[in-house]
Curated annotation (Swiss-Prot):
PANTHER family: GLUTAMYL-TRNA GLN AMIDOTRANSFERASE SUBUNIT B MITOCHONDRIAL AND PROKARYOTIC PET112-RELATED, GLUTAMYL-TRNA(GLN) AMIDOTRANSFERASE SUBUNIT B, MITOCHONDRIAL
Keyword list, A-Z: ATP-binding, Ligase, Nucleotide-binding, Protein biosynthesis
Swiss-Prot/TrEMBL GO biological process terms: glutaminyl-tRNAGln biosynthesis via transamidation; translation
EC main group: ligase
GO MF annotation terms: asparaginyl-tRNA synthase (glutamine-hydrolyzing) activity; ATP binding; glutaminyl-tRNA synthase (glutamine-hydrolyzing) activity
Catalytic activity from the UniProt record: L-glutamyl-tRNA(Gln) + L-glutamine + ATP + H2O = L-glutaminyl-tRNA(Gln) + L-glutamate + ADP + phosphate + H(+); L-aspartyl-tRNA(Asn) + L-glutamine + ATP + H2O = L-asparaginyl-tRNA(Asn) + L-glutamate + ADP + phosphate + 2 H(+)
The keyword ATP-binding is assigned to this record: yes
SUPFAM superfamilies, A to Z: GatB/YqeY motif (SSF89095), Glutamine synthetase/guanido kinase (SSF55931)
Family statement drawn from the similarity comment of this UniProt entry: Belongs to the GatB/GatE family. GatB subfamily.
Coiled coil: none
Membrane-spanning intervals of the chain: none
PROSITE patterns reported for this sequence: GATB (PS01234)
Protein's UniProt name: Aspartyl/glutamyl-tRNA(Asn/Gln) amidotransferase subunit B
Length: 484
């Protein structure tokens, strides 16, 4: 049977690092990029006698996440010890939640190819992150353990196996990432590992009612890797089934260099971790008043914001979706629109620049909107220069890039680079006459019906004027002199 005769079934476990200043059970910093083991203390090092103390901000962020995703917030939840041995886990167990998580149920709605899909959630629970093993590839082959990340607070968001393709899994994760960023609980930085996911993948013949044996693919930190890993794993399982071989339930790792998954270890079940209630922490009691306060503080979520952009500003679903994918970008867009002007036409102009040239420049520099030298007011100034005919499209692009990189004022860039358009009819007419005189054959063909030659003439005039002619005036004069 070909792959098309099988249905892939996917559930995701998303680990999101919470944007707290300190760790979940101690006061150590959660800052990324410090010297190895600089942000540690007896608690996160797992030293004897050190006792954990729960960070209240972690609970509030978990509740905030659960409310945004439509979960039931449990009034009482319990931490548990998840027992396993690994060099980056200093205590020999991870403090997580098992039987009584803080949030249950909920769902994530996402759009794929113009259709809405919904994936149900099983639960959201709080837990601490592990450390990081660092392997030296030099001759001595030494390995070290960096425990800066140990104890960093996470929420794990577990979906039901409702996803039916790699594309659905990617769009689900994009939608969830946008929600977490809009809530201010996660920065969405997959490269640094503050948002990563495991995928549980199985296949079954279409029409079958029983799910196949699942394999878990660990720690994917990009949308591209997630898609590649699921597609490879689905093919691998189908090939095993077609060959009459069993699919072994196991944990696998995705190798991005080879584009394939490979076996890590046999898949653990809950009993393998010997969960039991954490004796050093009391139950977490979440009062109804706290839940209602947090509910009242929830921001506009990405899906609602995108719908507002489409309904009130006339933006396309594509443009609106691109803007709300990052809450900081959407806020920057709102500020730029406020500085430039209201209405669908203004919104479209601003959106085009934000999702186009500014997105390209930000991708090159890796800068978040808060660090952009191109402010909303400066973009509005560029657009007003275009509206006034001072600069054209190509000139505006040069101005935007220069302002983005240097923070110079747009009008100063126009003067310094000599980008101002020539709108004087006399100057443009002289260039038009020169071009027509140099191309009498093409002019005759145009008058004979070859109207597509207008672009040729416009290009020649702009070349003659070193790109500074006002295109509207150039077009009008050419049409008049060519007899249109």
């Amino acid at each position: 049977m070909p792959l098309s005769d099988f249905q892939v079934v996917i559930g995701l476990e998303v680990h999101a690092q919470l944007l707290t200043r300190s760790k979940i059970f101690c006061g150590c910093s959660t800052a990324f990029g410090g010297a190895p083991n600089a942000h540690t203390c007896p608690v996160c090092l797992g030293l004897p006698g050190a006792l954990p103390a729960l960070n209240r901000a972690v609970v509030e962020m978990a509740v905030r996440t659960g409310l945004a995703l439509g979960c039931e917030i449990r009034p009482k939840s319990v931490f548990a010890r998840k027992n396993y041995f690994y060099p980056d886990l200093p205590k020999g167990y991870q403090i997580s939640q098992y039987e009584l998580p803080i949030c249950e149920g909920g769902e994530v709605t996402f759009t794929l190819e113009g259709r809405d899909h919904t994936a149900r959630l099983v639960r959201i629970h709080m837990e601490e992150d592990a450390g990081k093993n660092v392997h030296d590839v030099s001759a001595d082959g030494a390995s070290g353990v960096d425990l800066n990340r140990a104890g960093v607070p996470l929420v794990e968001i577990v979906s039901r196996p409702d996803l039916r393709s790699a594309e659905e899994a990617v769009e689900y994760l994009k939608a969830l990432r946008a929600i977490l960023m809009a809530l201010g609980v996660n920065d969405g930085n997959m490269q640094e590992g503050s948002l990563r996911c495991d995928a549980n993948v199985s296949v079954m013949r279409k029409g079958a009612s029983e799910l196949g044996t699942r394999c878990e693919i660990k720690n994917m930190n990009s949308f591209r890797f997630l898609k590649q890993a699921i597609e490879f794993e689905a093919r691998r399982q189908v090939e095993l089934i077609e060959a009459g071989e069993p699919v072994v339930q196991e944990t696998r790792l995705f190798d991005p260099d080879r584009g394939e998954t490979r076996s890590m270890r046999s898949k653990e079940e809950a009993h393998d971790y010997r969960y039991f209630p954490e004796p050093d922490l009391p139950p977490v009691i979440v009062e109804a008043a706290l839940v209602e306060r947090i509910r009242g503080e929830l921001p506009e979520l990405p899906r609602a914001r995108a719908e507002r952009y489409q309904r009130r500003l006339g933006l396309s679903a594509y443009d609106a979706g691109n803007l709300v994918a990052d809450a900081a970008v959407a806020a920057w867009f709102d500020a730029a629109l406020g500085a430039y002007g209201a209405g669908p036409e203004a919104a479209k102009k601003v959106a085009n620049w934000v999702t186009g040239e500014l997105a390209r420049l930000a991708n090159e520099t890796g800068e978040a909107p808060a660090a952009w030298k191109m402010t909303p007011a400066r973009l509005a100034a560029v657009l007003r220069l275009v509206d006034a005919g001072t600069i054209g499209g190509p000139g505006a692009k040069q101005v935007v890039e220069e302002v983005f990189r240097t923070g110079a004022e747009p009008d100063a860039v126009v003067k310094a680079k000599g980008l101002a358009q020539v709108s004087d009819e006399g100057a443009i007419e002289a260039a038009v006459d020169k071009v027509l005189a140099a191309n009498p054959g093409e002019a005759e063909k145009y008058r004979g019906g070859r109207k597509n030659l207008l672009g040729f003439f416009v290009g020649q005039v702009m070349k003659e004027m070193r790109g500074k002619g006002n295109p509207a005036v150039v077009n009008a004069l050419l049409r008049r002199k060519l007899g249109d």
